[in-house]
Amino acid sequence: MVSILAIRTFNPLGHFVSTQCVRAYAINSVRAGSKSSSVRAGSKNDTTRASSKKNKAGKSKLQLSARFKQNANKSQKADKFKSQKQFKYGLYGGLKENENKFLETNANLVEKITEFEELKLLPEVRKHVINLIKKDSLNTTEEIHPSPIQTIAIKRLSKNLMEPKLQVHAIAAETGSGKTMAYCAPLLDYLKRQEIETPEKWESIKDKAIIRSVILVPTLELVDQIYTTLTCIPDTLGIHVHKWTTGVDYQQLLENLKSRTDILITTPSKLLSLQRVRMISRADLILKRIEFVVLDEADTLLDKSWLEDTHKALKAMSDVNHLVLCSATIPNEFDRTMTKMFPNAIPLTTPRLHKLPKGINFRIINAAVSPYKGSKIKALAQTLYAIAYDGTDPGFEKRCIVFINEKKNVDNVVQKLRNEYGHDVVGLTGDMEGRTRLELIRPFISPPEKLTEQEKQIDKDLNDQETVNISGSNISIGNIENSNKASNFIPKLRVLVTTDLLARGLNFKGVRNVILYDVPITAIDLVHRAGRTARMRQSGRVFMIIDKKTQSWAKAVPTILKKNKALT
């Protein structure tokens, strides 16, 4: 007997998420007193048949039992394999396991497609995208190839790019993997194809005060970075890119709108503020004509503190054809929110999601041992000296980012590093005015500066001196006490002390060193902080300062990296 049970999963927004059929198989046992009850008792043949049936039934049960055991063993092996590939880091706020039915297909796609010429992009768009990537890269001599997430995203989005219906895609890939261009390339292609494939529509809108697409991000710094990325080379496509943030006055905004805005980069709250600008009549109609929307750092934009503004902004843009969610992490809470809001979203992920970048050299510094004796600030200062004198990046100034868990401690650390240890250091928190923040981070997001000839010689002399090991770690520095060369000189090292405000999405060009002054308490924080270095196949170092209170899951990070495990 076979019974079929149909199960429907229903979510609070009224969407049917999935329909499954679960088949339950029931094995009927043969009852005494059935058809065989008319057979004579004591018959030898009947006894033989009964014995045969009994043996067959016994074998059947044994075979069924064996199958169940095999399935159980397979399940146990799968769970064991999964546990070998995943590592539970942190106290709470875990990350979703990287599992979806497209992973294997995506991996094959990346292996098959290695050139931008193999992706469906208009020739002029392809050329422009390659030039944008080249301009944004530190190594301008190497040949430009699409990164795995760029291959996956461009390939999938181009499939039905111009269909006039809502399509939702969720891009998720490791930090520093080229996600910005993974969504910008299809966006640029979409805008140019509208001009070519629908000339009548294009003629009717090309001189109108409209916004054709929007990229929403959570911070001022990200608005500025994406705007710079898209405008860093001369415009060869005729695409008007504008930003709407605290650094743009209303008059400039109005001028931008009059000349047609093809791509507007802003935050959800600033986008909604268009409805309150008196000089803009019917802002609601402008928002309704937006057809392509990107939520970059979507896990932030859809968390509790941002969700209301983000939801209002999406609701105002009611005629969207493409919605792209982009993030370097998929926290469990974000995954639940995304499933409720966008049950039909197509995941576009890479196998390395939630893994630390391959190019990271992760080092532990124990502040509990001598000579620090429990002083984390001493361990931090000594580590900065080690970075300054280690002989890496010869001829260029070095940069280092120090991450702290709470903004109230930023100023204290900055003052001690500057006044007691003589480091060139600045601090940055969300309490600062927007323009001040942009000025402070500019040296860290720009390519590294070359040293002067005098600085190069001092740098070389210092790097030639003897080295001594730092206690409680696997790093060494120049033996400053025994050196007579430039004893009061610290090689050019810029240090930025900040919180998670700058751990999201920012491309710190040439930053090879990150120090985790406080141990990140969640896997999300660790992935984003460590991901400020070793971006786009570059190398980098992360130093984590620990003490007696540090949990074993934090101390295990170097092993996690070595074993290529994903964080959960």
Curated annotation (Swiss-Prot):
Keywords: ATP-binding, Helicase, Hydrolase, Mitochondrion, Nucleotide-binding, RNA-binding, Transit peptide
Domain Helicase C-terminal, first and last residues per copy: 379-568
Record's compositionally biased regions (Polar residues): 36-49
Region (Disordered): 36-64
Motif (DEAD box): 296-299
Catalytic activity annotation: ATP + H2O = ADP + phosphate + H(+)
One Gene Ontology CC term in the entry: mitochondrial matrix
Motif (Q motif): 143-150
GO MF: ATP binding; ATP hydrolysis activity; mitochondrial ribosomal large subunit rRNA binding; RNA helicase activity
GO biological process: mitochondrial large ribosomal subunit assembly; RNA metabolic process
The Helicase ATP-binding domain, residue ranges: 160-348
InterPro entries registered for this protein in UniProt: DEAD/DEAH_box_helicase_dom, Helicase_ATP-bd, Helicase_C-like, P-loop_NTPase
This protein's domain notes: The Q motif is unique to and characteristic of the DEAD box family of RNA helicases and controls ATP binding and hydrolysis.
Function recorded in the entry: ATP-binding RNA helicase involved in mitochondrial RNA metabolism. Required for maintenance of mitochondrial DNA.
Membership in a protein family: Belongs to the DEAD box helicase family. MRH4 subfamily.
Protein name in UniProt: ATP-dependent RNA helicase MRH4, mitochondrial
Native species: Candida glabrata (strain ATCC 2001 / BCRC 20586 / JCM 3761 / NBRC 0622 / NRRL Y-65 / CBS 138) (Yeast)
Lineage, top ranks: Eukaryota, Fungi, Dikarya, Ascomycota, Saccharomycotina
